[in-house]
Amino acid sequence: MQIDNIINPDVDSQIKKVEDRVQDQMNSGNEVFDIKVDLLQYMRQSVFAEKGKGLEIEHKFHFQDIEEQDCLLMQVPNINESGYYSGIVGLKSWIDKYHPELRVAIVDPVIDYFFLNPPDKQGEFFNLFNTYSKQSQYWLLYEHQQIFDIAYGFVGRYIEKAKPKFLGFSIIDGNIDATLAIAKLIKEKYPEVKILVGGNGVEVLDFGRLPNANYRTNEYTFIDAIARGDGEMTFADILKSDWSEESLMSIPGLIWNCNGVFIHNRMRANIPMDALPIPDYSSLEDNYYYKSVYQDTKPITMSRGCPYRCSFCSVPDYIPEYRYRTVENVLEELEGWVKKGKKYFFCHDSIINGNPKWLKELCEKIIERGLDINIGGNVRLQSQMRDIETIRLYRRAGLTKFITGFESYSEPVLKHMKKYTDVEGVREIFENVRKVNEENKGTKYEFPLLFGMQIIVGYLNESDEDFQKTLDFVEEFRDCMAEIVTCSVFLLHQTLLVKWRDVEKQYLEYHNGVNFTTKWNTPMDRLRRIEQAEETFKRIGIPYSIYNRGLYLELKEQQEKEQQSNEEIVVIDPIIQTEEEPIILFEDLNDIPKPQYKKNLI
């Protein structure tokens, strides 16, 4: 591929084509079909919702202006984590503050490519690109020209201009395959560049806390080093290493490739949260995806990990220890942004009320210092929120959007999930929000506090009755909700499978994480419920996003094909058949003569 033909001659005309395609899609009224294969849908919707306010679709390519660097950092995007920049921004900010002599730059070659070449969101390439249905089979991406274009035409362009010694990839559970595919191609073309991998996604590799045995690290000899745990100090040590065995052995938290064998060093202690510098996102402010997702909102991180252990959630496996910054440290960051004219913030924490007393103190200090801000973040429904004064405090401090793992309104389902199980308490929380929003009308707090709902459809012990309770609750409290952030058809992961089947001795017919049956539901039950949920969301007029439906539709299509094959296609065993006998296909197996023919289904 001639990269100059893509980047240089007429970028404006290509951007115009992107705008036209997106506008056609928006005008058509097409809704999000399945987020698992749709990276850009949300971005496009956000852009066009704001276009009337003067937001232009722009994206700056840094191929030409990037200077030589010691290391380039990138993360292959995945729709499940909109704040995917936070990890690599944290690494660069650490280097800038504590090791300014090192040159590190963040690049986003995949978004460069997708900006000019919007993918077929229901195509095979993008399905493979987002790690879901064929986990660990990264080589399947090599059947598609796009992965070569991304690696050689875009990532390679940065390498040739910046001449880095290192290329670092940050991985999450949904981008591992595309990362491996790109990293291998880069190593083959640029063998002198050291390939580094870090991020929470390393815990999915075969040695991790949430291991997938199919991710066999010893086969990834194109990777030079893996950072495990808090990566800031490990990353700095890697960049300063002379790459001798003695030097590499001395770096805690490092897993490194020694002539094809990976050596696991001792783990590194966690970094004190207040030692982390304020993340600097300035190098991304002219990035199409970043601008479209965040617009004028500033991402912040107040904590790492989560103190709870929801049955379906992997966060505690990735980050076992929950810890948070001091209130004063967070206030210092907020005040710094306010002085720069910023007032909208979104917290990338897994949970902002993991310590309710800490959040109460933060809110009180925000009010005390007169900070006029708006904050959104992930919130767990808790007993403290049954006190209406708590909700009033949150709103006065600027908390206006709670993304909450509501999941279900069934007590048995919530109990097995290890969620807040008091459904009457949940109702009281929503009633409190409704009351506070009503009493704030006509005041400076008139902008309502709203929930961004997360719902799981088809959990292990969810019956049709349980599911209907959830839909009824959503409809009843529609006025307290901004959107259905995620409505996910349930996928069964290995840890929960073992608990359900082997520890609890519950009935389970299991084929894979999509194709499983319990006493309460089947795969087709779950698919039917997600369709029913969508009908409800449309009827009550709430924005929504569906996750994992495509995987269930693929299963349905596969089962229908198998059924059709079993019913219609019967061939005659060639050993029994003679030259004089005709070849006959029987649609009805009962019509097959016996014993002359042996049934052989294909």
Describe the function of each predicted region.
Residues R209-A236, L393-K401, K469, F473-T486, ...:
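Structural recognition of alpha->loop->beta junctions
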Residues I3-D10, M26, D34, L72-S82, ...:
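C-terminal accessory regions of radical SAM enzymes
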Residues D70, W94, R103, H144-M267, ...:
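Glycine-rich beta-alpha loop elements in corrinoid/cobalamin-binding modules
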Residues K53, K97-P100, P109-L141, Q145-P164, ...:
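Conserved Radical SAM active-site core
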Residues D34-V37, Q41-E67, N257-P299, V571-I572, ...:
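N-terminal [4Fe-4S]-dependent radical SAM core
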Residues P77-S86, I171-I176:
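A short, glycine/small-residue-rich beta-strand->loop->alpha-helix junction that serves as a flexible
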Residues D274-P448, V457:
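Radical SAM [4Fe-4S] cluster-binding motif and immediate context
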Residues Y190-G199, D372-G376, L449-F451:
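Short beta-strand/loop segments at the ligand-binding rim of alpha/beta enzyme cores
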